[in-house]
Amino acid sequence: MASDIEIARGAKKKPIQEVAARAGVSPENLIPYGHDKAKISAAHLAGLAHNATGKLILVTAINPTPAGEGKTTTSIGLADAMNRIGANTLLCLREPSLGPCFGMKGGATGGGLAQIVPMEDINLHFTGDFHAITSAHNLLSTMIDNHIHWGGEPKLEAVRTSWRRVMDMNDRSLRNIVSGLGGPGNGSPSETGFDITVASEVMAILCLATDAEDLEARLARIIVGYTSEKEAVTAADIKATGAMMALLRDAMLPNLVQTLENNPCLVHGGPFANIAHGCNSVMATSAALKMADYVVTEAGFGADLGAEKFLNIKCRQAGLAPDAVVLVATIRALKMHGGLGKNDLGKVSYEALESGLENLGRHIGNLRSFGLPVIVAINRFTTDTEGEVHALQAYCEKLGVPVSLCTHWAEGGKGTEDLARGVTALIEKGEADFKPLYPDDMPLLEKIETVAKSIYRAGRVETTRAVRNQLAAWEKAGFGHLPVCMAKTQYSFSTDPALLGAPEGHVVRLREVRLAAGAGFVVAICGDIMTMPGLPRRPAAEHIHLNRQGQIEGLN
């Protein structure tokens, strides 16, 4: 079979105006970026308010292998399949980050015959949203330094400044740096660092804002540091909000592209799920629900991260409630969770598969605890045997969970029609009764412990007195009602990436907490997770190049 990029390059794309018409967007409400991508105008979004609301389908997964388990591919295949069976469906995905594209994972536009296009554009610069978000974030950094340099009011202490810089690249050498060297004319020396753009609070704010007014209000609430009296200083205090909004004027609008089968897809925002909240924008999801009968969206990494945050953060803030959840599982990941080495995942091992099924069972139980009906999607690989597939199907049937074998990578939407029928049947039963994991008024540390014990099955949360005092101070300052955003490894229920399967009684080490007052959550950084990733020993960038025709090769 051809490579992903070769398949995408051969796609028979329709003009974006035709794709927009399928989604009910008129030409005057379309802002084209070339022939195959566009933004949807604010006027169109505002005019959707009185439309009926569609059904929301969340796609999530078990804990993944480093290569991912095809969650995005399954989301695309499902949306194509639902349109094939006559269910008017819109797809909502996140924008890829350059870091993983050039790092370990590669692109994030699906694979095989389940892709969104234009693949190269979406994976790289797209419509410039990430550039705008990075620029807005770093403009605030610059204005903070300038405020300190000129002694502006309120008096912000350099040592109490908490705002770091960002860039959309994996670069471990920038995690911790000293800036302002070279004498008084070059700023005040201070320890700081860079995070990846997808971990930026500006990214989270853009993805959680309901409209331009809410976006500006959230930006204004960003806390950048404190005075000597420990009074919070915000982006509004240093008069940065207006200029940040100017940079984000176009980035706040959802992007429209198409699948290989010419179905419309909104791609907007891209926070990581292991170090941020891992969901596409509220504006895109809310708009899609007013534009189609069904909306398929995904949450990053496994259900312990992306889905937990989708349900406890995004749904809580935006008033959303999924009608069904698709849990993607692969035979190879289950065997890895059962103890098989990553180089042996193509080998048959019923013992490893049976042991690894506990990971799937844990995720099913967790999702059901939110009051949501679940269907398991088996993303089939060519190395899967009939016996292994039957063993997985039997396990799901034993738990009373519907299961569907999917071959969308090889067959596109046709290979996921059974899943599409299963999802619509599940929704028609009306069994969804969504409820978040914890109430707003629960203390912050207790919220962290609730996620750790209920979702991760940890025995306890271990942290420092400084972290406890910081959480107590934020509660006293009026932030105790906020949800928590757990930052931890995506490979395990625990904070140890090597502890696979379904561990219980482990210790979650809470190392640091950060207040994202504008986004509206408290980040709990656990274990050794980094908010600026590094490149692997053999980064994907080594294999990416331009051919003699000026086409990009190696981007998968």
UniProtKB/Swiss-Prot annotation:
Keywords: ATP-binding, Ligase, Nucleotide-binding, One-carbon metabolism. Pathway: One-carbon metabolism; tetrahydrofolate interconversion. It catalyses: (6S)-5,6,7,8-tetrahydrofolate + formate + ATP = (6R)-10-formyltetrahydrofolate + ADP + phosphate. It is an enzyme of class 6 (ligase). It comes from the Bacteria. Belongs to the formate--tetrahydrofolate ligase family. This is Formate--tetrahydrofolate ligase. It comes from Hyphomonas neptunium (strain ATCC 15444). The gene is fhs.
